[in-house]
Design a protein with these regions (language model features):
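Short, positively charged and aromatic/hydrophobic N-terminal segments
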Residues: 4-7, 11-12
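Catalytic cores of DNA base-excision repair glycosylases
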Residues: 15-206, 212-221, 225, 238
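Short Gly/Pro-enriched turn/cap motifs at secondary-structure boundaries
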Residues: 233-236
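Short beta-strand scaffold segments in enzyme catalytic cores
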Residues: 242-246
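Conserved small/polar residues in nucleotide/adenosyl-binding loops
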Residues: 249-254
Length: 254
């Protein structure tokens, strides 16, 4: 059953109190060493986030390094031709991302924006990407909510509201903002995303050695593999058939 956020907060208040601290402790011991983690340069973080929108970390790693070697800052990307940008994007697919990067770089006039509203207004940047950039680069208290975050929150708090429904998006966005450690938003956002990617995975999560197992609702209720929930949509496919009707007046005897 869907829960209003007020009811959700009342129901899980104790769990909320230990959630972020436990994640940060886990992250200190298990964080992944990624090149975009070792910088607070908003431009470099922006490039990494756009690459990772449709590309797995392992695949995007080398492409990121190659791209920023040729385009190390806003000015160099803005000054390049679209053909050259496409050349360095080749292999990543979803080329609209590269076109949006190029257009956004030109709109910046040499300086990366410094407010959430300005970052969110960049072409190709949505709520998640804006929150990630602002928290990682500027340590602003915005919760970045991606697939990993939906999964971790849904399982830990035992929430069965469909994550792709309007109500689900509102519920999880509000919850993500509530459990965010506002004194360490960059570390917290990276922690919960890494936790979802490494520990609380879609298939075969490592519940046996999970630091949150003692207070995880999905684990205690035997619903780990059932969460998060998505809306059931029946996919319809139109199929067309051609028929040939042959009629013959002749009769064959023999």
């Amino acid at each position: 059953m869907a829960l209003s956020f007020v009811r959700l907060k009342m129901k899980y208040f104790c769990s909320m109190n230990i959630f972020s601290g436990t994640l940060l402790d886990w992250y200190a011991e298990n964080k992944r060493d990624l090149p975009w983690r070792n910088t607070t340069d908003p431009y470099l973080i922006w490039i990494s986030e756009i690459i990772l929108q449709q590309t797995r970390v392992a695949q995007g790693y080398e492409y990121f390094l190659r791209f920023i070697k040729r385009f190390p800052d806003v000015a160099s990307l803005a000054a390049a031709s679209e053909d050259e940008v496409m050349k360095y994007w080749q292999g990543l697919g979803y080329y609209s991302r590269a076109r949006n990067l190029h257009a956004a770089a030109k709109s910046m006039k040499g300086t990366f924006p410094k407010t959430y509203a300005e970052v969110r207004a960049l072409k190709g940047v949505g709520d998640y990407t804006a929150a990630a950039i602002c928290s990682f680069a500027y340590d602003m208290p915005y919760a970045a909510v991606d697939g990993n975050v939906y999964r971790v929150l849904s399982r830990y708090f035992g929430i069965d509201v469909p994550i792709d429904s309007t109500e689900g998006k509102k519920t999880f966005t509000a919850l993500a903002g509530e459990v965010l450690d506002k004194s360490r938003p960059a570390d917290y956002n990276q922690a919960i995303m890494d936790f979802g990617a490494v520990q609380c995975t879609p298939q075969s999560p490592n519940c046996l050695f999970c630091p949150l197992s003692s207070s995880c609702r999905a684990l205690s209720e035997g619903k780990v593999q059932q969460l998060p929930v998505k809306q059931h949509r029946t996919k319809t496919t139109n199929r067309y058939f051609n028929y040939i009707y042959v009629r013959s007046e002749e009769r064959r005897v023999g």
